[in-house]
C-alpha cells in the first residue's frame, strides 16, 4: 500500500507544484521568466493556461492505455516504467525553466501527464489485493493520497522555489533554491518511488 500511496501522491503533487512557480515564469524582471520580451502579460497567462491544461489532458488520454498495458504485462512493470517517466518529465521541465525553453516546458508537462495516467494502474492494483472487507478502506487511502498530493503540491512548490526564506523562524532555505528546485525534488522523489516499486511491490495481477 505504501508504494501505491506514494505513486498517487506524487502524481497529484505534480499538478499543484507548478502553481506557485507560475508568476516567476512570466513576470517582468523575474530571473526565471521564459516568455520572450515582446510578449504581453496576457500572452504569458494564455501560455500558462495551456501549460497547466496539458497535464490533465494527457492523463485523460493515457490512463486507459496504461490500464490496458497493465492488464497485459502486469501492474509492477507498468508502474515502474511510468514512474520513471514521471521523474524524466519533472527533470525536462526543470531544464526548460533553466534554459527559458517553452517547448521543453510543454514536453515535460505532457510526459508527466502521460505517465501520470498510472493512477488507473494503481487503482487496479488496489482492486487486485483488496477483499470485500477492506476494499472501501483501501480505496479511501488512495483518495487520501490524491487529496494530500493536491494540497501539498502548491505548498512544496512555493517553499522550494524561494531562496533564503525563513521557515517559521527555525531556519532559512538555502540561497541556491530557485524555480527549478521543486521539480528536481519531485524527480528525485519519483526515482525513490520507482525503486520502492521495483524492490518491494509484488506483482498483483493473477
Give names to the regions the model predicted:
Residues 84-99:
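C-terminal ends and interior cores of transmembrane alpha-helices
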Residues 48-67, 148:
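Central cavity-lining transmembrane alpha-helices of secondary-active solute carriers
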Residues 9, 89, 102-117:
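Hydrophobic core of transmembrane alpha-helices in multi-pass small-molecule transporters
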Residues 108-146:
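Cytoplasmic helix-loop-helix junction between adjacent transmembrane helices
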Residues 142-199:
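Helix-loop-helix hairpin linking two adjacent transmembrane segments in secondary transporters
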Residues 1-56:
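Helix-loop boundary and gating motifs at the non-cytosolic
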